[in-house]
Structure formats: C-alpha cells, structure tokens
Amino acid sequence: MTATLSLKPAATVRGLRKSYGTKEVLQGIDLTINCGEVTALIGRSGSGKSTILRVLAGLSKEHSGSVEISGNPAVAFQEPRLLPWKTVLDNVTFGLNRTDISWSEAQERASALLAEVKLPDSDAAWPLTLSGGQAQRVSLARALISEPELLLLDEPFGALDALTRLTAQDLLLKTVNTRNLGVLLVTHDVSEAIALADHVLLLDDGAITHSLTVDIPGDRRTHPSFASYTAQLLEWLEITTPA
C-alpha cells in the first residue's frame, strides 16, 4: 500500500523468545519491518501480539533472541492516553524524548505536526473537548514528534466509528509515505489489515504460522481481489463467513 522509498529495516527480530514463568509466550519469532512499509500482526486474543509490540517498544526487557531497532520507536495505543490537564499542544510536546531541542522549537514542531494530522487550530484546546478521532490524531502527532523510524500501533482505530476509522486509516498511510516510516500494526480487524498492510503475519500461540504479502493496486477496498485476500486470512483464522 505504501510507496517504499527505502528497504532500510526499521526493525529486525530474529529468534525472539519470551516466557512468563513456565509458559513460553513467544516461540522463536523472526520478522523484519522495513521503512516505508506497514506490517500487520493479526491473531486471536492471547496469541502474543501485544507482547511482541512491548518488546519492540522496549517495555519488556527479559527475552532471548536478537532485536535491532533503528532509532527510538514510538507507540500509539487504542486509547489515546492524553493528559487532561495539559493543552493539546503540550500533550504533543510531552512525547519529545530529546534534550537538544529548545522549548520554543518543540512547540513549533508540535504545532506543525498538529497541522499535518489535520488539527491546525487545536493547539490551545483541551483533550476533553476532542472527539475520539481527534484525540487519536493528537496521539499520532505525539508519537511522531521525536521523528521515529519505527511506529508501533496497538489497535489504534478499534474504538472509532466506521467513518472516523476510515479517515484515520487514510491519514496513517499518508504519514507512512511522507515520513518513510516502518509500522507494526497490531489489529484484530482482518479487513483493516488487508486495507493498510504490505505484509500480514498471523500469530498463533506465540509463533508466526502464516505470512501474506498484499499486492493490490489503487483503492484496495474497492478492488476485486480485496475479498480473496480477506477470505485467505479468515481461513487461516478458521473463521467461516455466511454463505
């Protein structure tokens, strides 16, 4: 879906294993997330999707295997997690993890990012006045302010209504193309995975059991092959659709 400007890896994982007590929740995971591409990770609840994301984000340290990340990754969750006592602008600058940038420069960068995510007049707004879609866009701006090469998304559109979800998905793709980001998208939504991802990985009981490269030109959702890609993923998930 994305126009790949570079095949530089944003993240490379080899032989990743992780256990909680005696239960091994990740069983030798291998994956590469390239800059300019979206990789979707699907699977049933408890399959290990969020655990992989937490490892890549540096939030889970005790594991074996090799994990190489280009720069500092950024994370956005299903819940925007905005601080209600800070303005929208200050919420975005809160995501800056660099000390070599002045406060005024940070504010300028945050304001520019809000314009980029289609919220140009919201600097002084308060989080509680925002719609769900607007809050999610602020969360995206906050994730981008440190100029990451790897963006980790954990069900980012799950709480949005259908129309707002489509708008947010299109914004994500434009952002990936403009910034040449590598993205790992954790989702339960098979249609979303096909609409957004260059590669889809199925995780089952801590292991990647299937992988799919999505090659659909133009508007994916209206393309005849969209249904066949979706059916393939549903078959892997052992989900039957009504006749």
Swiss-Prot record:
Provide a GO CC annotation, any one: plasma membrane
Listed GO molecular functions? ATP binding; ATP hydrolysis activity
Q: Which cysteines are joined by disulfide bonds?
A: none
Which annotated residues bind ATP? 43-50
Q: What stretches pass through the bilayer? A: none
Q: Give the keywords, sorted.
A: ATP-binding, Cell membrane, Membrane, Nucleotide-binding, Translocase, Transport
Q: Which residue ranges does the record assign to the ABC transporter domain?
A: 11-230
The cross-references to InterPro entries, in alphabetical order and at most eight, read:
AAA+_ATPase, ABC_transporter-like_ATP-bd, ABC_transporter-like_CS, ABC_transporter_ATP-bind, P-loop_NTPase
The enzyme's first-digit EC class, named in words, is translocase
Q: Which PROSITE patterns match?
A: ABC_TRANSPORTER_1 (PS00211), ABC_TRANSPORTER_2 (PS50893), SSUB (PS51291)
Indicate where this protein resides in the cell: Cell membrane
Report the superkingdom from the record. Bacteria
Has the keyword Amino-acid biosynthesis been applied to this entry?
Answer: no
- What does this chain do? Part of the ABC transporter complex SsuABC involved in aliphatic sulfonates import. Responsible for energy coupling to the transport system. Is also involved in taurine transport. Seems to not be involved in long chain aliphatic sulfonates transport (chain length of eight carbon atoms or more).
Similarity comment text for this entry: Belongs to the ABC transporter superfamily. Aliphatic sulfonates importer (TC 3.A.1.17.2) family.
Protein name per UniProt: Aliphatic sulfonates import ATP-binding protein SsuB
